[in-house]
Amino acid sequence: MAMAMGHVMLREFHLDNPSQYFTDYVRRYTDMPMLVMLEERDGYYAAGRMLRAADLVDSLGQENNPEWKTVAINSNGDMVAPNGSIGFRWGEKGKWNLEQRDGTSGDETELQLSLLGSQDDIAEVGFPYFGGEGTEHFSKVELENILLHKLPVKRLQLADGSTALVTTVYDLTMANYGLERGLNDENCATSYDDVKAYTPAWAEKITGVSRSQIVRIAREFADNADKTHGRSMIIVGAGLNHW
């Protein structure tokens, strides 16, 4: 059900009617803008590791720990190694923070969350799906074990001469949640009533909670977080991590 709530929140507060607070938060304080290298599989791609400054020609000017510095694309279309990744922890002062600054120049920079609209190509990326395995106590929704989604990608020349396809964590997240963004992705939903991975209708079949209730609680939870700048909380009972 939490996945279906996430589907609603991302659809309504990031795509259809973007919340300035949410957008600014994920841009500044999460790895959503960071680039991820895609690995070739049998007829499709899969998410690999983060792109690092050391993967690129001249390491984006980073001489200190470039193999530990993640990379993003800023609003000007330039690749940068922004402050805050673990590579800035040692050997440099004043850069292990979440200020929106280029780690090389120190200039303020705004990171792109998505490659959509500036992509070099569209690639099919596979995501594992585990909701098709049911038991007598767990209802299932049978879909393919690997769900292929269409993602915007950039094609980069690496320091070793090879070429890599990259996308952002944000784009991977949107695809994994099954959110259609104009790419004609048959495994993405165009309605909350579509029984596709992580929609309210999908969750209703597994949990028995009506899709309308899932949509309502997700919408209210996100709306409160938007208006109060994050003051929404899910409280669970005592468990393994409680103590």
PLM-predicted stretches and their roles:
Residues G230-I234:
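Generic beta-sheet signal
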